Amino acid sequence: MARAKRVKRDSATNIYRTCKQAGTCPPDVINKVESTTIADKILQYGSAGVFFGGLGISTGKGTGGTTGYVPLGEGPSVRVGGTPTVIRPALVPDTIGPSDIIPVDTLNPVEPSTSSIVPLTESTGPDLLPGEVETIAEIHPGPSRPPTDTPVTSTTSGSSAVLEVAPEPTPPARVRVSRTQYHNPSFQIITESTPTLGESSLADHIVVTSGSGGQAIGGMTPELIELQDFPSRYSFEIEEPTPPRRTSTPMQRLQNVFRRRGGLTNRRLVQQVPVDNPLFLTQPSRLVRFQFDNPVFEEEVTQIFEQDLDTFNEPPDRDFLDVQSLGRPQYSETPAGYVRVSRAGQRRTIRTRSGAQIGSQVHFYRDLSSIDTEDPIELQLLGQHSGDATIVQGPVESTFVDINVDENPLSEISAYSDDLLLDEANEDFSGSQLVVGGRRSTSTYTVPHFETTRSSSYYVQDTKGYYVAYPEDRDVSKDIIYPNPDLPVVIIHTYDTSGDFYLHPSLTKRLKRKRKYL
């Protein structure tokens, strides 16, 4: 028997509307619509004994009471629709409009008998143009000079008169000289003196002179107390530690030993594979499989190599066989003090039927060679300083050469020999070949060499540009067989003195040798 499908009934509000008049409403619908459930009764009975005021705590929507919800730290809320408070300004605003009111004269009515010509009259309105501008200029006269008397000398001799006028004296000029000095902290002045030619002492003297005289400061009176020489600011010594440090911030040995015990150097858990190929430092993926180079890709991250299970690809390097992943480079220091570049790899050697791959962990590493330090070079300070200057005197550092005037070294015949112009190179033509004819249409023919009881060799004529190679030693006096003879080819031994000839064994008919095992 099939179970009837359950049909969802209508909402409680719609059911209450239709069944209330008929009196067939279910009890749960009546309680829900009329709010007579157990929860509603608890609230009704509880509200009779407890009063919460206007907090609005009930089964209805939360409104926060009559004042609404107010966030902490803020003032009362503003209700929408209220009349805002207008704040009047403290100053009385000025009215906008013309400042001066110009009166307009009224015109009398015009009669018909009045002339239509309007006489011109002067306007009595206010002048819109500005009036006269008063200019006030203050004149400050310069300092008045005292009057100078110019002497005039008059001389009279005879009939001519000579008038001598003395030049006007020049008034004294007022000159003002100012000087400004700025201090540069990046520039340091070296006050040490350098022994040069003409100086008799190394004392530091400061001489201040002017146009009328001078005064010497320092070095005049000897010191009567025992003094101590302080080293110059540029002379210092660097103490080398023993043993010398290889890094600027050396680490503790205990930490290095703790790091060596675990990680990639654990030989029990990780296979150690040294790599000699320099591609391991820049492009390690080329050691795992053949591929094209991508100049944009940087191989400084972990690389994963996917390989089909049904195919087997031989890697370029046998040490990277069955490598699935190759980690990023790690730099460390070996006990000998070298820099080591390491990469952690994972092999996938065994594959199960379910598709799982099992392999060992591999540590690929390469030790970089050391950089030998060169011998230190003694450097000197640039500038003028004392104690390290070098003075070279010309007469003392001269070189004297004793030259014999009797000999004439300019004679080329006596000084040099023609044997220096001879070429001492020995030319060796063993194994060379002589080519006769052009190289454009050359043909090569191989001539068989027949071994006979007598030592004799035969060659083809080489007069039409053919190239014949003779790998064995040959004698000049040999017989020549022409390519197109008029008669049948017959081999004649010229060294035979009997006067007869015989057919060469290579020209006879060969008989097949019967094998017993066939």
Swiss-Prot record:
Region of interest called Disordered, as start-end residue ranges on this chain: 139-173
Cystine bridges: 19-25
PTM section of the record: Highly phosphorylated.
GO MF annotation terms: DNA binding; structural molecule activity
InterPro entries named in the record: Late_L2
Keyword flag DNA-binding: yes
Pfam families attached to this UniProt entry: Late_protein_L2
Subcellular location: Virion; Host nucleus; Host early endosome; Host Golgi apparatus
Motif (Nuclear localization signal): 1-10, 509-517
Residue ranges crossing the lipid bilayer per the database entry: none
Cellular component, GO, one term: host cell nucleus
An annotated GO BP: microtubule-dependent intracellular transport of viral material towards nucleus
UniProt keyword annotations, A-Z: Capsid protein, Cytoplasmic inwards viral transport, Disulfide bond, DNA-binding, Host endosome, Host Golgi apparatus, Host nucleus, Host-virus interaction, Late protein, Microtubular inwards viral transport, Phosphoprotein, Viral penetration into host nucleus, Virion, Virus entry into host cell
Compositionally skewed regions (Low complexity) per UniProt: 150-160
Family: Belongs to the papillomaviridae L2 protein family.
Function: Minor protein of the capsid that localizes along the inner surface of the virion, within the central cavities beneath the L1 pentamers. Plays a role in capsid stabilization through interaction with the major capsid protein L1. Once the virion enters the host cell, L2 escorts the genomic DNA into the nucleus by promoting escape from the endosomal compartments and traffic through the host Golgi network.
HAMAP family tied to this protein: PPV_L2
Record's subunit section: Interacts with major capsid protein L1. Interacts with E2; this interaction inhibits E2 transcriptional activity but not the DNA replication function E2. Interacts with host GADD45GIP1. Interacts with host HSPA8; this interaction is required for L2 nuclear translocation. Interacts with host importins KPNB2 and KPNB3. Forms a complex with importin alpha2-beta1 heterodimers via interaction with the importin alpha2 adapter. Interacts with host DYNLT1; this interaction is essential for virus intracellular transport during entry.
Protein name in UniProt: Minor capsid protein L2
Protein species of origin: Human papillomavirus 20
Gene from which the chain derives: L2
